[in-house]
């Protein structure tokens, strides 16, 4: 099956920064979690993540590539057998950056919600997101890096998904297209719930249509229950958490003297 398809059971999401170069109106990052941790503090968090028996780290944010030393952290993680997945909007992922991360990254998940520039702008990604992502897909695949596409389905983009599928049919990626329901938790997402949220039945209807009409695309989907049960996370301020019933359960802080209990033991 190869490393691209190796299943990792102990996964951790690290929202390493809440800073971002986009302003998505569905974003569920914790805006009160901003920090200015240095490399030493981030390395302490990383070592503790590894000590829990973590097999995969999803590097996220905010925009993880805004952290100046994030590649040093990825290098350390890879040295210790971690499967590194980067979730990014791609804006900072030029060819130089791709070459920097290539030895340490296993998968890059590019966030794109539409190939309609006006839709992307209305969601908060800007008019140029389509052009950026198309360029990054090509360059990442040419570099031998696995590429996923992450799409959050909201009222603003649900009618654009067929066009996205047409593009991905003609320009195949080497990973999967992940369609996710809008997750109404924390500041921005919670505030915009009414104007964004798509009914589950409507979501499943378009997902099933896409899977039927575009069998050549590896389409997967995630509902809210799956999203919040997926795996534990570490906030930018070091808080270790799991999410249950749309509420964050803080298990402790990863830079404090008292190490939190192993999150993989939380049911």
Q: Where in this protein do the model-derived segments appear?
A:
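Canonical Radical SAM [4Fe-4S] cluster-binding loop centered on the CxxxCxxC motif
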Residues: 3-40
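Exposed loop/turn and edge beta-strand positions of beta-sandwich/beta-sheet ligand-binding modules
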Residues: 10, 55, 228
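Short acidic donor-binding/metal-coordinating loop in glycosyltransferase active sites
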Residues: 16, 61-62
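Residue-level recognition of short loop/turn positions
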Residues: 23, 61, 236-238
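Pocket-edge positions in alpha/beta enzyme catalytic cores
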Residues: 34-37, 62, 125, 195
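Radical SAM/AdoMet-radical enzyme domain recognition
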Residues: 39-59, 67-161, 165-179
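Radical SAM enzyme [4Fe-4S]-AdoMet core and its adjacent flexible, acidic
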Residues: 118-231, 236, 241, 245-251, ...
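Cysteine/selenocysteine-centered motifs that mediate thiol-based redox chemistry or coordinate metal-sulfur cofactors
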Residues: 264-267
